[in-house]
């Protein structure tokens, strides 16, 4: 029988990681393995029974020098699992992680694209596959991992429906992570127009065989499917979200003169633009694959003031007759050209030019 009193931290970290293989998604397992490797280097071959609470606090001091709280909390997941495993085996009495709570992580504010930025992206020449994917992401709110796994078998153009059945995470096609994520997405007229254009590009492509990891993180089902979006550089479906970001999205933003952010912000843009327009929060949540509006409130939605309707005037018009007062009617704005938008963005990027223009305008009689 194994002498558990002689087991090291490395022994139990390995046991914990092994136990996770079929319990968590592959991407989570990769994260756990990465954190476990760093922890094994830190503790080395220290006996698991020799590690005390003070050692854990010293570790945190070291981690705080290099990592954000969110990442340190990911280390905690591995630590808790490792010591819990050891305690269950009787190798230790009490886990040194007992009563250790996660650190407060800073909330990362969404950074959705404004209408002016979206117009600039739309007006910039680039890979049509990538541009169509970008626009579809804004119009449907799906995850980028779901978008690059989208196939023509998932789309019913006549019924204006799209089904989210799988995602591409790292190197694996897998079923979506929650029951709500496997869903039907309504397609509006704009989305239909984009898909009809994309159909001409990939509708004739041969079906590809893929293996889809199921929700038990063990079973796999083979499928033959025609993918909607291709990487024009490889003439193959995008490998994963990181490739989409690197080969298309980042350079395309630079070309359009739009501030860089990750492709995940396209999903945020769907939520934020629709919230700002006063569209039902429940509908937004359902389209995005959430069972309620909590995630829209907490994580995805952000009020885009520059694109919001004039609600103050609308409020005044609503009560004007009540107080026997008159309110001026809203002035309809003509469509702003993409050239004008580009000019404004260029001036904003160079304050010295903006100051010069303001001086010239101010000097006019």
Residue ranges and their predicted role:
Residues 154-161, 260, 279-299, 327:
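Short, polar N-cap/turn motifs at the start of nucleic acid-interacting alpha helices
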Residues 2-10, 14-91, 107, 236-244, ...:
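N-terminal core-binding DNA-recognition domain of tyrosine site-specific recombinases/integrases
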Residues 73, 88, 92-93, 98-150, ...:
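Basic, Lys/Arg- and aromatic-enriched nucleic-acid-binding interface segment
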Residues 2, 159, 170-172, 176-191, ...:
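C-terminal secondary-structure termini that scaffold catalytic or DNA-interacting sites
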Residues 104, 154, 202, 269, ...:
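The DNA-recognition helices of helix-turn-helix-type DNA-binding domains
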Residues 112, 168, 288-314:
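Catalytic-site neighborhood detector that most strongly recognizes the C-terminal catalytic loop/helix
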Residues 69, 123, 127-128, 140, ...:
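Short, basic (Lys/Arg/His-rich) helix/loop patches that form interaction surfaces
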Residues 39-43, 79-87, 195-198, 252, ...:
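Hydrophobic recognition helices of helix-based DNA-binding modules
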């Amino acid at each position: 029988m194994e002498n558990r009193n002689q087991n090291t931290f490395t022994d139990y970290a390995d046991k914990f990681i092994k136990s996770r293989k079929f319990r968590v998604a592959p991407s989570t397992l990769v994260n756990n393995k990465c954190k476990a490797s760093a922890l094994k280097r830190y503790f080395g071959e220290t006996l698991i029974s020799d590690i005390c609470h003070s050692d854990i606090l010293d570790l945190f001091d070291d981690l705080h020098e290099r990592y954000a709280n969110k990442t340190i909390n990911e280390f905690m997941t591995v630590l808790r699992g490792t010591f819990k495993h050891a305690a269950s085996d009787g190798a230790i009495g009490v886990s040194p992680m007992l009563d250790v709570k996660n650190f407060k992580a800073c909330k990362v504010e969404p950074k959705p694209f404004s209408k002016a930025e979206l117009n600039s992206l739309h007006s910039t020449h680039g890979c049509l596959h990538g541009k169509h994917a970008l626009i579809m992401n804004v119009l449907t709110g799906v995850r980028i991992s779901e978008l690059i796994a989208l196939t023509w078998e998932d789309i019913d153009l006549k019924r204006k429906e799209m089904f989210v059945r799988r995602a591409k995470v790292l190197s694996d096609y897998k079923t979506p992570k929650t029951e709500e994520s496997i869903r039907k997405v309504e397609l509006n007229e704009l989305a239909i127009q984009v898909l009809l254009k994309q159909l001409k590009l990939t509708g004739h492509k041969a079906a590809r065989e893929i293996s889809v990891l199921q929700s038990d993180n063990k079973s796999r089902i083979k499928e033959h499917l025609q993918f909607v979006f291709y990487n024009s550089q490889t003439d193959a479906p995008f490998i994963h979200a990181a490739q989409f970001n690197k080969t298309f999205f980042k350079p395309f933003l630079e070309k359009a003169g739009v501030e860089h952010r990750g492709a995940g912000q396209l999903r945020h843009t769907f939520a934020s633009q629709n919230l700002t327009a006063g569209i039902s929060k429940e509908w937004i949540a359902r389209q995005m694959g959430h069972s309620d509006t909590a995630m829209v409130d907490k994580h995805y939605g952000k009020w885009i003031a520059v694109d919001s309707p004039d609600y103050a005037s609308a409020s005044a018009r609503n009560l004007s007759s009540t107080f026997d007062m008159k309110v001026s009617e809203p002035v309809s704005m003509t469509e702003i050209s993409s050239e004008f938008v580009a000019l404004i963005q260029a001036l904003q990027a160079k304050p010295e030019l903006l100051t010069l223009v303001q001086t010239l305008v101010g000097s006019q009689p």
